């Protein structure tokens, strides 16, 4: 990426689109393994947003400190965690979180059993005492992010769009409501390719929102945190 300023403008704009001003929130980031290597775009984004929030911080695997600090924080909070770390927190502590949006990202990456997203979110909701699990969808190849505020239904900022393709014919785009591979158009990829073909499978509806249902069979496991292995 030639300009980090463009990346910052994109992720700030996407965050404000769905959550308003960062200063309204405290952001707590539970991102083990992402923090153990340099160059993670997710860590960079979280770090800048934490600074704009003015409160919160990174927690590698110190769950006691995380829960203690969140309990003492009077502001509305976002707990941004990689999926397998949130599951660990739910199993070990099952804390009832007050004034908190729980936001998962990153998937299991081979660290935990893959289960249906609805079942996983139900486990987290029951453990944390929240009504819905939010999600952030992004990847190293994208400058922008999509967000789900519950129900695994993602929405994009205005400069990003998702379309559905036939998994057996990459040149055939499918009509709204069809299930297939997801292609992403990200106009913030100014100095790189703005058209990304992913190995995620899902459905795009006529309002532009999309649902992720899994990965194409035999697709590679993705995630920059895996580089620490």
Give the positions of each predicted feature.
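Active-site glycine/GP-rich loop and adjacent strand/helix microenvironment
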Residues: 23-26, 39, 47-229
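Conserved AMP-binding A3 loop
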Residues: 1-12
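Conserved aromatic-histidine-acidic binding/catalytic patches
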Residues: 3, 30, 34, 112
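Conserved AMP-binding loop of ANL adenylate-forming enzymes
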Residues: 11-46
């Amino acid at each position: 990426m030639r300009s980090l300023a463009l990346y910052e403008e994109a992720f700030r704009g996407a965050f404000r689109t769905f959550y308003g001003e960062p200063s309204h929130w405290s952001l707590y980031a539970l991102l083990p393994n992402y923090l153990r290597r340099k160059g993670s775009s997710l860590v960079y984004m979280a770090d800048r947003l934490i600074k704009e929030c003015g409160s919160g911080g990174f927690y590698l695997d110190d769950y006691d400190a995380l829960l203690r600090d969140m309990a003492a924080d009077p502001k509305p909070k976002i707990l941004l965690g990689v999926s397998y770390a949130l599951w660990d927190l739910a199993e070990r502590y099952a804390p009832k979180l007050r004034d908190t949006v729980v936001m998962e990202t990153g998937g299991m990456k081979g660290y935990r059993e893959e289960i249906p997203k609805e079942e996983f979110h139900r486990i987290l909701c029951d453990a944390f005492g929240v009504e819905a699990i939010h999600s952030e969808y992004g990847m190293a190849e994208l400058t922008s992010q999509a967000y789900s505020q519950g129900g695994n239904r993602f929405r994009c900022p205005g400069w990003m769009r998702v379309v559905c393709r036939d998994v057996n014919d990459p040149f055939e785009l499918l009509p709204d409501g069809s299930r297939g591979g997801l292609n992403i158009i990200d106009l913030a990829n100014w100095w790189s390719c703005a058209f990304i073909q992913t190995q995620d499978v899902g459905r795009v509806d006529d309002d532009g929102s999309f649902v992720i249902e899994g990965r194409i069979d035999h697709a590679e496991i993705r995630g920059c945190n895996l580089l620490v292995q």
